[in-house]
Amino acid sequence: MPGKLKVKIVAGRHLPVMDRASDLTDAFVEVKFGNTTFKTDVYLKSLNPQWNSEWFKFEVDDEDLQDEPLQITVLDHDTYSANDAIGKVYIDIDPLLYSEAATVISGWFPIYDTIHGIRGEINVVVKVDLFNDLNRFRQSSCGVKFFCTTSIPKCYRAVIIHGFVEELVVNEDPEYQWIDRIRTPRASNEARQRLISLMSGELQRKIGLKVLEMRGNAVVGYLQCFDLEGESGLVVRAIGTACTLDKLSSPAAFLPACNSPSKEMKEIPFNEDPNPNTHSSGPSTPLKNQTYSFSPSKSYSRQSSSSDTDLSLTPKTGMGSGSAGKEGGPFKALLRQQTQSALEQREFPFFTLTAFPPGFLVHVGGVVSARSVKLLDRIHNPDEPETRDAWWAEIRQEIKSHAKALGCHAVVGYSESTSICEEVCILSASGTAAVLNPRFLQDGTVEGCLEQRLEENLPTRCGFCHIPYDELNMPFPAHLTYCYNCRKQKVPDVLFTTIDLPTDATVIGKGCLIQARLCRLKKKAQAEANATAISNLLPFMEYEVHTQLMNKLKLKGMNALFGLRIQITVGENMLMGLASATGVYLAALPTPGGIQIAGKTPNDGSYEQHISHMQKKINDTIAKNKELYEINPPEISEEIIGSPIPEPRQRSRLLRSQSESSDEVTELDLSHGKKDAFVLEIDDTDAMEDVHSLLTDVPPPSGFYSCNTEIMPGINNWTSEIQMFTSVRVIRLSSLNLTNQALNKNFNDLCENLLKSLYFKLRSMIPCCLCHVNFTVSLPEDELIQVTVTAVAITFDKNQALQTTKTPVEKSLQRASTDNEELLQFPLELCSDSLPSHPFPPAKAMTVEKASPVGDGNFRNRSAPPCANSTVGVVKMTPLSFIPGAKITKYLGIINMFFIRETTSLREEGGVSGFLHAFIAEVFAMVRAHVAALGGNAVVSYIMKQCVFMENPNKNQAQCLINVSGDAVVFVRESDLEVVSSQQPTTNCQSSCTEGEVTT
């Protein structure tokens, strides 16, 4: 399918002064695609040139259209010397290759230089004419849509979810080539940016080909990562979920339905909710969009390390308890048989989605993870990346076997990551083992009778909590009780999962962000000795991280974790672990037991007194947390709950039929179940430190909530005021007498102070919630710790939420809190005195932008195809897959950009803070410009996947690499939809257009 690419250079503005004599510039432009280059005329002596060039035409194959970026270089003409480069613009042509997407790219693009940053803007118009080619041997995948969002896009319907797609490409890193010794830093950076752009395009094309082979037309949950392996080379890899999507053409699908989510669900068969509940986790106003996304399920297990499958806390094969009482064994057997046959033909039945349609997940079995330590070697042949492929195949095979051991045949919420230091690389993968409904995996399933069939066979609202394994064949003891909701099937006492909370899950109270942080020193070593030391440390780190999560979850009085993300980072002399998740109280699970401290030194009065004092503090903290998060579950008589799991010696006396019975209740053993306390033994100073660390987490100030999932459980009435922010903080440690305890304290202080500074800066938005909080920790150099956090602050109407969420069960849970105006409850200590040396303050910037009413008015006609003359106000940016108070009407394509910034005058640019802030602000500006040129007005599912910072203070130098991605979309405010809608306007929708962005 060859095509014709047409480019027109219109004008430039705000160019830098390149001729010191005249304080002006003689600018011209080179337009390059592939091996063909065109040049404009030189526009003499102007900082705002008007080229108005002719149309430059490139006749190329569609394979090149997908692989190659359009390069636009702005230069200053010199008569007697080499032309000076002003900057470059890379434009991805891929969004123009979709039949439903934009037909033209037109707008002002920032001219970017890797040394000086943004240096003016250039107005470019790009068009593509494609010729249809049905050649079955073609190497392009034009028309396959890519989405970063990990749920089904809002204005689409999933026909089939095909499954996992992955690919990786390798090459030599230009930064480590011999020619790099003789070329300028600018030339080296630009060679690197161009190569990464080429590899990214090639990767998308290859994944698109795999999707076409599976007869799909889209990739959802697309995650692309760069592995900078130094001298070993450069690896670009990606994973995603292949789907067949249908565009929802019905205008009714986009109408607002503020307080009636069920109205929208009935318009879309995939989202039929057969069992509405007044206190579901999905908010009403923003999540009118969310009804298009898949409702996830939950699971519980410890992460199983690559060497120890038995760490998984969700047991093995067998049918075990079903998902609903009316579903008997025959249906479950048939369901499992169908699903297994549907998934057997797939090598890896993985899904990168974190949200699913109701009924897609039948059961979940637990968090499964695998890690592997590898030694990097040089990539000899870039065309044959078998080594890296084999590494990841091993990891995926292990994940698959872990899931099978848990009685599950699929893994959802799947993700992969790496951590590289010198020659050592840690490969990590994690997901949630699950049993899936085969109807969504086969063709012809989404027809008219789907709603009726779903109502017949769907599990109840608590079905995802029920165990998918046979309780009589568990490889380890676990506490199971009868479900507190249906009281017919067994549930574990705790659930861990890597996916989002289902919109139909019944939760009590609100959720909160729970983090486990851990540092471990290691000796400096080389090659195999280093890899061995890391391998020996990993299992213990995972165990300690898991223990921290369990303790903090119980301290909060909650019983489930969602969105669990564990990151292990390797440095030259230390390993760091950071786990983030959102804790909630699920109504279907038993009330968590308390935490009991047991000492090992009897007959010591002062010690016993200290232990009792600590025990009292823990009990008080649990009580305060239950009040803070409004956790007050209704009392259920223990006779209803059922019996605990028998000991192994008793199991042989029980018949299998008894495990299927939901009516027989044996005598209750009060030593099990919800009466059981979690015992912490204090036998050394490390154990005491662990207990102290439990009590050092300061709760957020009044009016603030935080979570790492898209939506805060228990909060329903969001307003349309949002602020996205990115914060980077770097500290340098002193190597003198550094111990594990001191390292842990410094790391804890760093993360806590980062959160405190965010609460302080966002205090004017109270009451608000920090959603999608994403922490990333890296060790760029010896004794240097860098923490990057991105999140979005969303305000909510607290009074309205109190009125709308009250139910007969929950009236006792609601408190009429009147402390909204109260600010901080903690002393603000942004620079901890305990740090051995000065921490760098965060790269600060307050770029608060307000969308004018005029700009918002332009959104009214956004349902029409974007044209060259269309104007876009402020381009919104959010890590969420939706925009509160708005409807997404069109997806314009994926934004995937990689930038390098280098400076040789670090101190003059404001130090690390000024340098990082300026670079991040420039990245935002370039992302916004590309989205606006496509005719979009927002970026959703935005993520900063990499932020690699390196500095050399002695030479006053620094370098930073940033990789960002997201989905460019067109959205319409619900207030605008009400004007054009023929239906009755809905109420209780706030449509304030104030939105900003805080970059710290």
UniProtKB/Swiss-Prot annotation:
<comment type="function">
    <text>Required for insulin-stimulated glucose transport and glucose transporter SLC2A4/GLUT4 translocation from intracellular glucose storage vesicle (GSV) to the plasma membrane (PM) in adipocytes. Binds phospholipid membranes in a calcium-dependent manner and is necessary for the optimal membrane fusion between SLC2A4/GLUT4 GSV and the PM.</text>
</comment>
<dbReference type="GO" id="GO:0032587">
    <property type="term" value="C:ruffle membrane"/>
</dbReference>
<feature type="binding site">
    <location>
        <position position="84"/>
    </location>
    <ligand>
        <name>Ca(2+) 3</name>
    </ligand>
</feature>
<feature type="modified residue" description="Phosphoserine">
    <location>
        <position position="305"/>
    </location>
</feature>
<dbReference type="GO" id="GO:0005886">
    <property type="term" value="C:plasma membrane"/>
</dbReference>
<feature type="modified residue" description="Phosphoserine">
    <location>
        <position position="671"/>
    </location>
</feature>
<feature type="binding site">
    <location>
        <position position="78"/>
    </location>
    <ligand>
        <name>Ca(2+) 3</name>
    </ligand>
</feature>
<dbReference type="GO" id="GO:0010828">
    <property type="term" value="P:positive regulation of D-glucose transmembrane transport"/>
</dbReference>
<feature type="modified residue" description="Phosphoserine">
    <location>
        <position position="817"/>
    </location>
</feature>
<dbReference type="Pfam" id="PF23025">
    <property type="entry name" value="YbjQ_2"/>
</dbReference>
<dbReference type="Pfam" id="PF00168">
    <property type="entry name" value="C2"/>
</dbReference>
<dbReference type="GO" id="GO:0005544">
    <property type="term" value="F:calcium-dependent phospholipid binding"/>
</dbReference>
<keyword id="KW-0597">Phosphoprotein</keyword>
<dbReference type="InterPro" id="IPR056430">
    <property type="entry name" value="C2CD5_YbjQ-like_dom"/>
</dbReference>
<feature type="binding site">
    <location>
        <position position="81"/>
    </location>
    <ligand>
        <name>Ca(2+) 3</name>
    </ligand>
</feature>
<feature type="modified residue" description="Phosphothreonine">
    <location>
        <position position="666"/>
    </location>
</feature>
<feature type="binding site">
    <location>
        <position position="19"/>
    </location>
    <ligand>
        <name>Ca(2+) 1</name>
    </ligand>
</feature>
<dbReference type="GO" id="GO:0005509">
    <property type="term" value="F:calcium ion binding"/>
</dbReference>
<feature type="domain" description="C2">
    <location>
        <begin position="1"/>
        <end position="109"/>
    </location>
</feature>
<dbReference type="Pfam" id="PF23028">
    <property type="entry name" value="YbjQ_3"/>
</dbReference>
<feature type="binding site">
    <location>
        <position position="84"/>
    </location>
    <ligand>
        <name>Ca(2+) 2</name>
    </ligand>
</feature>
<protein>
    <recommendedName>
        <fullName>C2 domain-containing protein 5</fullName>
    </recommendedName>
</protein>
<feature type="modified residue" description="Phosphoserine">
    <location>
        <position position="200"/>
    </location>
</feature>
<keyword id="KW-0813">Transport</keyword>
<feature type="compositionally biased region" description="Gly residues">
    <location>
        <begin position="319"/>
        <end position="328"/>
    </location>
</feature>
<dbReference type="GO" id="GO:0065002">
    <property type="term" value="P:intracellular protein transmembrane transport"/>
</dbReference>
<feature type="binding site">
    <location>
        <position position="19"/>
    </location>
    <ligand>
        <name>Ca(2+) 2</name>
    </ligand>
</feature>
<feature type="modified residue" description="Phosphothreonine">
    <location>
        <position position="601"/>
    </location>
</feature>
<dbReference type="InterPro" id="IPR038983">
    <property type="entry name" value="C2CD5"/>
</dbReference>
<dbReference type="GO" id="GO:0030659">
    <property type="term" value="C:cytoplasmic vesicle membrane"/>
</dbReference>
<keyword id="KW-0966">Cell projection</keyword>
<keyword id="KW-0963">Cytoplasm</keyword>
<feature type="binding site">
    <location>
        <position position="76"/>
    </location>
    <ligand>
        <name>Ca(2+) 1</name>
    </ligand>
</feature>
<feature type="binding site">
    <location>
        <position position="78"/>
    </location>
    <ligand>
        <name>Ca(2+) 1</name>
    </ligand>
</feature>
<feature type="compositionally biased region" description="Polar residues">
    <location>
        <begin position="274"/>
        <end position="289"/>
    </location>
</feature>
<dbReference type="InterPro" id="IPR037785">
    <property type="entry name" value="C2_C2CD5"/>
</dbReference>
<keyword id="KW-0653">Protein transport</keyword>
<dbReference type="GO" id="GO:0005829">
    <property type="term" value="C:cytosol"/>
</dbReference>
<feature type="binding site">
    <location>
        <position position="78"/>
    </location>
    <ligand>
        <name>Ca(2+) 2</name>
    </ligand>
</feature>
<feature type="binding site">
    <location>
        <position position="26"/>
    </location>
    <ligand>
        <name>Ca(2+) 1</name>
    </ligand>
</feature>
<feature type="modified residue" description="Phosphothreonine">
    <location>
        <position position="807"/>
    </location>
</feature>
<feature type="region of interest" description="Disordered">
    <location>
        <begin position="265"/>
        <end position="330"/>
    </location>
</feature>
